[in-house]
Regions:
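Extracytoplasmic gate region of multi-pass secondary transporters
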Residues: 37-39, 217-262, 266-267
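Helix-loop-helix hairpin linking two adjacent transmembrane segments in secondary transporters
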Residues: 137-138, 142-191
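C-terminal transmembrane helical hairpin of 12-TM major facilitator-type secondary transporters
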Residues: 283-330
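Helix-to-loop junctions at the C-terminal end of transmembrane segments
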Residues: 69-81, 271-284, 368
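Intracellular juxtamembrane helix-capping segments at the cytosolic ends
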Residues: 122-135, 324-338
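A late C-terminal transmembrane helix in Major Facilitator Superfamily
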Residues: 337-371
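Conserved MFS/SLC helix-loop-helix module at the cytosolic interface between two early adjacent transmembrane helices
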Residues: 68-105
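Cytoplasmic helix-loop-helix junction between adjacent transmembrane helices
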Residues: 112-149
Length: 406
């Protein structure tokens, strides 16, 4: 179902490559949007008359907005079409960007941040199904490019900020990009939603063959959803607080602190392609364990020995081993565990990730003050959550190898 105002009836369908391009541009800007507040934290503290706690509250509202709308967005996408869903996501992102500049306190900024969370929900619910439907022969690769486009934008943004400095130039430019995209999407015929793909014969056969050793919903299902939270928590908290950690704890310059996110994003971009290849040859649980242990170890090293070199190496490690596709590996395991309920379990897994974007910054507001020690404590929390994830991972891996679930 399409709203009549959005699309002309006799309009020819757009090429699928054009639709994919629209999706990637949308995520390119959204990827930059989610780190804007942390990248301009000092400037926003003056504009909104607040401190680091206030900045954390604004950041946390992204997660709350995502939590509130994530289930609604999925229903809306199936009911009213991928195009209309993406349009709502794009408009929400524009509202966020404009709102950042006109806000004069953290409460106005927090309301605007809710719209970015809404953009997250509607972009995901419209874009991922669209790519899966338009590219049925290679959905995983096309969806991986979403992460790649976000990583690319997060690589470029800190460099642009270092060169331009002014939020009054960068943020309106991002809004204009989305505005132009919105115009193109509004007059493009996306075609009808694809039908739900039925289980293949091989999937049905696999279910029958492993019927005596099925994963437990209460143990394996819940455990994987917990990993959906912990895996997201590690890289999200790092991406939000690494720049200010570098300034307050290490004593680095603002320019250096912002480049940490560039290293993180470049590494993440590289990892997207390498991890997608590795996971075809190595058991996914082995990939999860190795990646998570390396990420947790580097975080711990940075907490114990915070230096510019260690911070840069940690950015590279977190980008590659925590943000470059490991979350998607967990989702793949969960989908293979419960092939008859892929949609539902994906929703639970995504909801756990959305919880990260709210819980992490909110908890940080109770830890942060104006001292460097409080920032160290935030990263100690990140390490603790990483260790918790590894413990859950080991339990699930032992069960997987013992009962040969996959």
């Amino acid at each position: 179902m399409e709203f009549p105002i959005m699309c002309k009836k006799n309009q020819p369908k757009a090429k699928r490559s054009v639709l994919a391009f629209y999706v990637y541009i949308n995520y390119f800007v959204w990827g930059s949007s989610i780190i804007l507040v942390s990248q301009f934290h000092s400037w926003f503290m003056e504009l909104w008359h607040t401190d680091l706690k206030g900045i954390s509250i604004v950041i946390s509202m992204l997660g709350l907005g995502h939590l509130i709308t994530v289930l609604l967005a999925g229903w809306f996408s199936d009911k009213f079409g991928r195009k209309n869903t993406i349009i709502i996501g794009t408009i929400s992102n524009i509202i966020f960007l404009i709102g950042l500049l006109i806000s004069r306190n953290i409460w106005m900024a927090s309301i605007c941040s809710l719209f970015l969370g809404n953009a997250n929900s509607f972009n995901d619910s419209g874009s991922y199904p669209l790519l899966t439907e338009k590219f049925p022969e290679k959905p995983a690769s096309m969806n991986a490019l979403v992460k790649a486009s976000m990583s690319l934008s997060q690589t470029i943004l800190p460099l642009v900020i270092a060169a331009v400095h002014s939020a009054y130039i960068i943020i309106p430019a991002m809004a204009v990009m989305l505005g132009l995209l919105l115009l193109k999407v509004s007059v493009t015929n996306f075609g009808k939603n694809g039908s739900i793909v039925k289980e293949t014969v091989s999937e049905q056969k696999e279910i029958l063959e492993t019927s005596t050793n099925k994963p437990s919903v209460l143990i394996d299902g819940v455990g994987m959803v917990i990993l959906g939270f912990t895996l997201s928590f590690i890289f999200y908290m790092y991406s939000q607080y690494a720049p200010v950690f570098a300034e307050k704890v290490i004593g680095s310059t603002p320019v250096f602190s912002k480049t940490l996110i560039s290293w993180y994003a470049i590494s993440s971009l590289i990892s997207v392609f390498i991890t997608s290849t590795v996971v075809r040859k190595v058991h996914p649980f082995k990939v999860l364990l190795v990646y998570s242990i390396v990420a947790a170890a580097m975080l711990a090293v940075m907490v114990v020995h915070p230096t510019p070199t260690i911070a840069r190496l940690t950015s590279i490690a977190i980008g590659f081993f925590a943000a470059g596709g490991i979350w998607q590996v967990g989702l793949t395991i969960l989908s293979r565990y419960f092939p008859r309920e892929k949609g539902r379990v994906t929703g639970y897994y995504s909801f756990a990730a959305a919880l990260t974007y709210f819980v992490g910054p909110i908890v940080s507001t109770f830890i942060l003050d104006d001292t460097a020690a409080s920032l160290v404590h935030v990263f100690v929390l990140d390490v603790a959550v990483s260790v918790l994830g590894i413990i859950v991972m080991i339990i699930l891996a032992v069960r997987c190898f013992k009962y040969k679930f996959i």
